[in-house]
Amino acid sequence: MNYEKKVLLCPDSQEGIFTSVYEGWSWAVKGIDVAILIKEPENLELFCSYINISPDLEKAQKVAGTIRKRLGWYVYETLCYVAASGYEEKGTIILQVLVQALGKGGCGRQIMDKLTDPYVNLALKLRTRVWHELHRYYG
């Protein structure tokens, strides 16, 4: 079995990140380490496959629809705020939150209550930062 880490490189957009989530889902639920980055790292890692992902509206809409339907609007809004943040590993955060919520033995709509989980905690912090920045911009 191949346990090589997969690094998905995508554009810095919600559509690009959600397409990468769609592509990386099958590896992530099998326990393979998957990272989603918005730009190529300066130092490449050994034993990693770097895969460029092109945005696909249909795949991104499927991911968004699944989040809204199975996890609710609060989780969807939170993940959209994370996608709008300037954090470089925001794609990985979104993927890991979804794997924990929808994967085998997932907690579903209560995922945002798992504050001790580092990915959920960081997602909520990024949501707050982006929300404050947005409301500071609009006055």
Regions found by a protein language model. Give the residues of each.
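Alpha-helical context
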Residues: 1-2, 39, 43, 74, ...
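Generic preference for well-ordered secondary structure
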Residues: 2-6, 47, 51, 78, ...
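N-terminal ordered "arm"
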Residues: 2-55
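Phosphate-binding glycine-rich loops and adjacent basic patches that engage nucleotide phosphates
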Residues: 24-25, 84, 88, 121, ...
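Intrinsically disordered or highly flexible coil/loop and linker segments, enriched in small
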Residues: 31, 73-76, 132
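A basic- and aromatic-enriched beta-loop-alpha substructure that forms the phosphate/nucleotide-
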Residues: 56-112
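Internal, well-folded beta-alpha domain core
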Residues: 103-139
